[in-house]
A protein has these predicted regions:
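Short, hydrophobic transmembrane alpha-helix segments
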Residues: 36-50
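Alpha-helical transmembrane segments of multi-pass inner-membrane proteins
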Residues: 10-29, 33-39, 55-67, 98-102, ...
Length: 512
């Protein structure tokens, strides 16, 4: 009997140590990593890379003891270890990252990254290592949720204040005036902020649907309102694309329960109220607020605000007097699904028609953003067209494993002079997650990277029937993929993504 107790202790002590260290690491990454900056946003890419490298490096070193203990028990047959598909996809991405470094266009940048794109091999190895250790040792804790809410709220408030040309923390002190509208928080560029927000705000929206405590519900309502305000203040199209996908999914799943449906109306109402608040700020502050452009201009028009106010009134009446039986909600979900598929089909036909028949007629209008040409998406079309064309001309080995992490600049360099002449700058990434992964780690890397995400989404969708909170995993990953259509992964969001994938798979594994 004594020997049995000693064996249990031998197993549990390293395991408890691993869980404790992992919890501290998660608190650091969720609570400190997003908000940390050295007093200025100059060189913020390098600062974030160093912060993550040190934090993850120390974490992985400390985790060697519990990992080796756990591995020894698995090797001796005292403990069974199941390798799921997410691990296989992570392994594929790891192989692609390693091989791509060996055949990289610039091996130094492939290993270390460059001054703008810091996601070189070292960072990716730390991300993948974090994923595996978090997946095996993480224990979900309410403290992590609060740390995440506080840190992301700080990011939102920074974005709102700076959009109003009010830098209360003097973060922009060394940034030239022409760039100040772009750098709005300790996460730097507005597009980097959207990538981070896609990993936190959608989860809060789902939590609002599910929560039962009145206090938590009120906190989440305030959090969502501020987060939505920041999305508008970022003035970037990727934020609109991301939140549109979130709402389309949220509405669909909300039909499953009357409480969810009514709370979904509240979330949409908070979104409209946030837009009205931003509109009022734009009227009151006028020139003291950075101007809106592209799709953002639609949300600061009086017609949009009036329409939103009408919808708020309708939602209020629906919540007070609506009679949403289970049968009505089921029919509503069915109609909604059919309508969305029809609209999606019509949208695809519309986009194809614009590109092949009416591209010249819509030039200079908002619809021109749907036409694939050099001017599309603030120059994104330029880099997308050339990226796709050059990738097809690469040697077969590079098509399989890529040109090296951090090497997109070298990949696109043949158009250096042309980019400087047309845009006054050079593209360091393709502003598209798929193209970024494809160029840097090849087809194998694409299968591994997106396989991890899609498998986790599929597992979350399946598990949510028994554990409703997994719906948050599905929607936030969908939101990340949506904004990734216009943005590329960066040092600001990639570590958080891999940690969330590990945390999600850990939680889902514990429910088996």
């Amino acid at each position: 009997m004594g020997k049995k107790k000693n064996k249990i202790a031998a197993v549990s002590v390293p395991d408890l140590f691993g869980k404790g260290i992992t919890n501290v690491y998660l608190l650091v990454m969720f609570g400190l990593f997003p908000v940390f900056y050295p007093g200025s946003l100059i060189g913020i890419h390098t600062v974030k890379k160093e912060f993550f490298t040190i934090s993850a490096g120390v974490y992985l070193c400390l985790m060697l003891i519990p990992f080796l203990c756990k591995a020894s028990f698995v090797f001796k047959g005292k403990e069974r270890k199941k390798i799921d598909r997410s691990d296989i996809f992570a392994g594929l991405f790891l192989i692609a990252a390693l091989v791509s470094t060996g055949i990289a266009l610039n091996q130094t940048e492939a290993v270390y990254g460059n001054s703008t794109v810091q996601t070189g091999l070292i960072v990716m190895l730390l991300c993948i290592g974090s994923y595996f250790f978090v997946k095996n040792f993480a224990v979900w804790d309410k403290g992590l949720i609060w740390a995440n809410l506080l840190a992301s709220s700080f990011i939102y408030l920074c974005g709102i204040f700076i959009a109003c040309r009010t830098d209360i923390l003097n973060m922009q002190k060394d940034i030239i005036d022409a760039q100040k509208a772009m750098f709005v928080s300790p996460l730097g560029n507005i597009n980097f902020n959207v990538a981070y927000i896609s990993l936190v705000l959608p989860a809060a929206a789902v939590m609002f649907l599910l929560c039962k405590e009145v206090f938590t519900k009120r906190v989440l309502a305030a959090y969502l309102f501020v987060g939505f305000m920041d999305l508008f203040c970022l003035r970037v199209d990727s934020a609109i694309v991301m939140i549109l996908v979130v709402f389309l999914l949220l509405i669909y799943f909300s039909f499953e329960q009357e409480t969810w449906f009514l709370r979904c109306l509240s979330v949409i109402g908070l979104f409209f109220a946030a837009n009205i608040a931003v509109f009022i700020l734009s009227v009151l502050l006028k020139d003291h607020m950075y101007p809106f452009n592209s799709l953002g201009t639609l949300f600061v028009r009086i017609e949009t605000v009036v329409l939103e106010f009408i919808f708020l009134c309708i939602f209020f009446v629906m919540q007070k007097k609506g009679n949403f039986t289970k049968e009505r909600l089921w029919k509503g979900q069915k109609i909604y699904k059919i309508t969305m598929f029809v609209l999606l089909g019509l949208f695809v036909v519309f986009v194809l028609a614009l590109n092949f028949a009416f591209s010249e007629r819509v030039e200079g209008t908002l619809l021109s953003n749907l036409v694939l040409n050099d001017a599309m998406g603030s120059g994104r079309g330029y880099v997308w067209i050339r990226t796709g064309g050059r990738f097809l001309d690469l040697p077969f080995l590079n098509q399989l494993f890529g040109c090296g992490l951090g090497c997109f600049y070298d990949f696109i360099n043949p158009w250096y002079d042309d980019m400087v002449a047309k845009f006054g700058a050079v593209f360091y990434d393709p502003h598209n997650d798929f193209l970024q992964v494809l160029v840097t780690t090849g087809i194998v890397g694409v299968v591994g990277f997106f396989g991890m995400i899609l498998h986790t989404m599929a597992a979350a969708l399946k598990k949510r029937k028994n554990q409703e909170m997994f719906l948050a995993v599905f929607i936030l990953l969908a939101a990340y993929l949506a904004q990734g259509l216009i943005n590329s992964y960066t040092i600001f969001s990639t570590p958080i993504l891999f940690i969330l994938l590990g945390l999600a798979n850990s939680s889902m594994g514990n429910t088996d």
